[in-house]
Amino acid sequence: MITSALLFLALLPNHQIAPQTIDRKALVDRHNVVLTEFDGARPLQVGNGEFAFGMDITGLQTFAPFNTMAQWGWHSSPLPVGKRIEDFNGQVWDTHGRPVRYPMPDPANPEVSFWMSANPHKINLGRVGLLMTKADGSAVLPSDLKRTTQTLDLWAGVVTSRFELEGNPVTVKTACHPTTDALAVQVISPLIKLGRISAFLSCPGDNPRYFANHVGELNSPATLETLRAEGNRVDLVRKLDATSYHIGLQWSGKASFGPVPESLNLPIQIVKAEYGAAKQWADVTYIVSKAITNNRLAIRVNSDNLVPDPAVGLGKLLRVTYSIGSQAQVVEANEGEFMVIEPSAFGKRLQLVPARDADSLAFTCTFTPKRLPSNLPTVESAFDSSRKGWASYWQTGGAIDLSGSKDPRWRELERRIVLSQYLMKVNASGSFPPQESGLVNNGWYGKFHMEMIWWHKAHYALWNRWPEVEPSLEIYRKLIKNSVALAQSQGYKGARWPKAIGPDLHEWPHEIHALLIWQQPHPIFLAELDYRAHPTRATWQKWAPIVEATADFMASYAHLNPTIKKYDLGPPMVVVSENTNAKITRNPTYELGYWRFGLRTAQNWRRLGGLPPKSEWDRVLKNLAPLPTQDGQYKTYEGIPDMWTKFTYEHPALIGAYGMLPGDGVDRPTMARTFDKVAKTWDFERTWGWDFPMLAMCAARLGKPEQAIDFLLHTSSGFQFDARGLATGGPFPYFPSNGGLLYAVAMMAKGWDGSSNGNAPGFPKNGQWRVRWEDLSPAP
């Protein structure tokens, strides 16, 4: 019998090989990140979901002012003098013959409207780097470091950075404590005995920018107040208007802590300046050097002030390496912004100097919004906890191993899968939904977007990593009071969920935010994923009020069209692609499909709880407008003009109705024709990162697995993964790309409701792919 069973398995095609035990450590280790060059724009990170630290090639923030960010790290600037939040009134738009007030910029109160947009904003908690000098006492530049190698041990969450300075080896180990917002650092080098290496701590000033790779104002560093200085520990507090937080520094061995000597009178030296984008850069060192006046650089970044456009059609930036005395750093500014460099950028730095007889410098730096605890993590305990925490993460939840595949693309796809799991744990597993760039930098002032919660969080359900998703789903319970009030103020029932918010839970005034609707069914989808994993009364009770309020709004939002006796969605409304006229947009394909899924699922939730179905939900569900078609294909919305000539850019969301969603209201042959048309005509250089997993999921459901793989490895510049796993697809980095990839591959490996029983139904069945997986759940 055993022999017969083995023979049967041996005769199965490769794609049907049953799941086997995966060597998870080997799977993860083969994708450890190895870097060999300095990059002032893209950090490597350590973090725990609540807190993250971005580093340059030195293992710290020595040259590049990367960010230290936390879920709790927000600040609100004071309101303009004489202004009040209560003065804000938004705008009134006609909505099916009713005047409805929306949270849009208030023409009568532009200052308050802008303040509400920019506040609260995420802040950079601090910068930790190395201070190094050459033998002659001059500043060390990135180019002075030789034999640079930086390795991220994914299984341990530890980064080891090695380099040589004038022939002297330096090794820096960096990690983050898994449950405390603490950075652990160990530096080993003979330069310590020579007094040529130490560590610094500084905090940039506040500068709420719409987008910022380097967050904060470097030229206005904060003053840190010392609360405690005893033995090998210093407790500091930073105060910023009404915001304050604490920093605790604890070190091993002998060291002294104090201010770095000021360099305010030393000249600024421009070492290198380049202007451009992608691979098109112009050397502007001479021009930038000549722009220094009275030892201060202030220059607007544009082609008029620098050189003729070196990268036509691309958003450019100015990147400058400069030194002041024995200190150096690399800064950048986007096109249209001012770059300002002043000697004060190195002011107010605090320095940890190891004793001259020491062999190493080891310390932890802990950040907290409250007073520091009596015991801070030691270096040893932080590294040990990191190793144990990451090993536990990798050994729980799902895994996908593609190493037996013949298609040479398997390694790159598997690399993206593994690195995305690391990055999403670091950036998107905390107590709040992440912003789209996670804890790397700031986009849209750092606010999180509620329509993106699906792309950031849904994959955790398919990978059975519920500890990484459950804390942030509390956002719906926190929001329900405000959301019910918003719906009522607009004449609707239930809860209207916002689009872009911060921890104050107030909508950022904006036309798109006020009219977007595709985030509305998300909590029903997420509740369904939770119940599928945890089919208990407790799960039902947890989600029932949210599902009920969500569906109540969805049913009351739909408007009965008296002419055709069908329920319309919009206008006014903003669709997923955000590129149509909100005042005429009606009945978009994706939103109609999601409305059907949401109302159908909500009715089923009532049945699960022993409640009768709601008649008003049924009435809307049964009479909702059909998904719009023309020439046998779906359209973005009903009546859209020139669909395939003017609107083949931004999100091809109509595909999502049968991919991301299970296809309520979808005719499969019509969707197949639509998919083929999109694949042939869409401008994939003008899309976003999560569009490609969405297309892959649609391809998988349509029985086009080869195209599903092609979309997950598409050549578009909007869906690329760098050596760290950081993805393009929006303002860089763009984590919906990573989250979408993880959802899509899990669905393709495990399957979805109604998919074939074979292994990996979404992967090609051509003998080129051998897919092994563990502990995945199917998609709806």
Task: List the model feature ranges, each with a label.
Residues 110-144, 604, 739-778:
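Catalytic cores of secreted or luminal carbohydrate-active enzymes
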Residues 14-265, 345-446, 466, 479-484, ...:
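Acidic/polar, glycine-enriched structural segments that form the non-catalytic walls/loops
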Residues 549, 553-605:
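Acidic/histidine-rich catalytic neighborhood
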Residues 1-8:
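Sec-dependent signal peptide recognition
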Residues 432-447, 497-515, 570-588, 718-730:
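Acidic/His metal-coordination segments adjacent to aromatic residues that form catalytic metal sites
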Residues 263-346:
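Extracellular, modular beta-sheet/disulfide-rich ectodomains of secreted and cell-surface proteins
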Residues 401-414, 432-446, 480-483, 529-537, ...:
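Primarily short, surface-exposed interaction patches in extracytoplasmic proteins
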